[in-house]
UniProtKB/Swiss-Prot annotation:
Group of enzyme by EC: isomerase
Renumbered residue ranges of the record's region Disordered: 124-160
Pathway(s) of this molecule: Lipid metabolism; prostaglandin biosynthesis
PROSITE patterns: CS (PS51203)
Job description of the protein: Cytosolic prostaglandin synthase that catalyzes the oxidoreduction of prostaglandin endoperoxide H2 (PGH2) to prostaglandin E2 (PGE2). Molecular chaperone that localizes to genomic response elements in a hormone-dependent manner and disrupts receptor-mediated transcriptional activation, by promoting disassembly of transcriptional regulatory complexes. Facilitates HIF alpha proteins hydroxylation via interaction with EGLN1/PHD2, leading to recruit EGLN1/PHD2 to the HSP90 pathway.
Protein name: Prostaglandin E synthase 3
Source organism phylogeny: Eukaryota, Metazoa, Chordata, Craniata, Vertebrata
Provenance organism: Homo sapiens (Human)
Keyword terms: Acetylation, Chaperone, Cytoplasm, Fatty acid biosynthesis, Fatty acid metabolism, Isomerase, Isopeptide bond, Lipid biosynthesis, Lipid metabolism, Phosphoprotein, Prostaglandin biosynthesis, Prostaglandin metabolism, Ubl conjugation
Transmembrane segments: none
Length: 160
């Protein structure tokens, strides 16, 4: 029995944990106020996985849930205190080799503000317009379409 590999990420009201177990069977997820216990049989060899996580902060076990797919089990933990950032998933600072941050879904929601997003939207619009207007006539550049030989078109000497 060994822990399943997992990825996690933080949101304003929820913490998400994805246990990466393909073809899982007999999935059991137990949500407690400050602990999560996950177990299942996984893969074609029905290997037994068990993860016990002492959580960084409390959650609402009644409003937390999980969903199984063919590739993983996604747990959605409702934070006990909404809007509180979790700098890590576990209570202890110890590095767990089976647990990593899901940077594909990570979002720094603490710094979000409408003003910041409006600046980003303006920047994005400016970048889109940098390609120029397609209807603009550009001046002719001498030799741009010329098929004449340049000095760098000469034959290279053979290597010795």
């Amino acid at each position: 029995m060994q822990p399943a590999s997992a990825k996690w990420y933080d949101r304003r009201d929820y913490v998400f944990i994805e246990f990466c177990v393909e073809d899982s069977k007999d999935v059991n997820v137990n949500f407690e106020k400050s602990k999560l216990t996950f177990s299942c049989l996984g893969g074609s060899d029905n290997f037994k996985h068990l993860n016990e996580i002492d959580l960084f902060h409390c959650i609402d076990p009644n409003d937390s849930k999980h969903k199984r797919t063919d590739r993983s089990i996604l747990c959605c933990l409702r934070k006990g205190e909404s809007g509180q950032s979790w700098p890590r998933l576990t209570k202890e600072r110890a590095k767990l080799n089976w647990l990593s941050v899901d940077f594909n879904n990570w979002k720094d929601w603490e710094d979000d503000s409408d003003e910041d997003m409006s600046n980003f939207d303006r920047f994005s619009e400016m970048m889109n317009n940098m390609g120029g207007d397609e209807d603009v006539d550009l001046p002719e550049v001498d030799g741009a379409d010329d098929d004449s030989q340049d000095s760098d078109d000469e034959k290279m000497p053979d290597l010795e």
